[in-house]
């Protein structure tokens, strides 16, 4: 009789131990589900905050690109690295409203800045008599947003272009 009782207790203990494992697995799964839900909520909040800032910065300009300066100056050679480290690019306005947003930064700081003009650009804003490679092989925009050939060795306002792909 004791042998049957001990066997029963052993089986009950094994069953309870397995039950605890299952409870532990369920608890772990529930914890993971809760953590994923928190991450999803935090991601949605972060995305909303980012888009709010983006929309506020581009409000009234009609541009989906942001043009931001750190108020420093640089030669063209160092500009790509500066912008890249910040997650941006050298400005390359493709539309009039983008050039206007770029111009707003230049006008606010009363300084010129470098930009990149692609070979197949649909939009350009060259000043009269430009481009003129005698002035240099780089391109700068003045405080009115007009483009000029320029020396790549000029220290111009650092402006980087940022855009979002959603």
Swiss-Prot record:
Belongs to the alpha-type phospholipase A2 inhibitor family. It comes from the Eukaryota. Pfam families: Lectin_C (PF00059). GO terms for cellular component: extracellular region. It comes from Metlapilcoatlus nummifer. This phospholipase A2 inhibitor neutralizes the activity of basic PLA2 myotoxins of its own and related venoms. The inhibitory profile shows specificity towards group II PLA2, either belonging to the catalytically-active (D49) or -inactive (K49) subtypes. Homotrimer; non-covalently linked. Glycans are attached at residue 122. The keyword Secreted applies. N-glycosylated. Disulfide bonds join 83-160, 138-152. Residues 46-161 form the C-type lectin domain. Expressed by the liver. The lineage of its organism: Eukaryota, Metazoa, Chordata, Craniata, Vertebrata. This is Phospholipase A2 inhibitor anMIP. Keywords: Disulfide bond, Glycoprotein, Lectin, Phospholipase A2 inhibitor, Secreted, Signal. One of its GO terms (molecular function) is phospholipase A2 inhibitor activity. The keyword Translocase does not apply. It is found in: Secreted.
């Amino acid at each position: 009789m004791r042998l049957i009782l001990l066997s029963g207790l052993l089986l009950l203990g094994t069953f309870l131990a397995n039950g605890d494992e299952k409870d532990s697995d369920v608890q772990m799964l529930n914890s993971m589900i809760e953590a994923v839900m928190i991450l999803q909520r935090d991601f949605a909040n972060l995305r909303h905050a980012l888009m709010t800032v983006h929309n506020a910065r581009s409000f009234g300009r009609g541009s989906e690109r942001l043009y931001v300066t750190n108020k420093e100056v640089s030669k063209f050679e160092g500009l790509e690295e500066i912008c890249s480290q910040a997650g941006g690019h050298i400005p390359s306005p493709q539309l009039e409203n983008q050039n206007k947003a770029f111009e707003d930064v230049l006008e606010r700081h009363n300084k010129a800045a470098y930009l990149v003009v692609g070979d197949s650009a649909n939009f350009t804003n060259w000043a009269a008599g430009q481009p003129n490679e005698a002035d240099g092989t780089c391109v700068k925009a003045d405080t009115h947003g007009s483009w000029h050939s320029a020396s790549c060795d000029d220290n111009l306002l650092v402006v980087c272009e940022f855009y979002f792909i959603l």
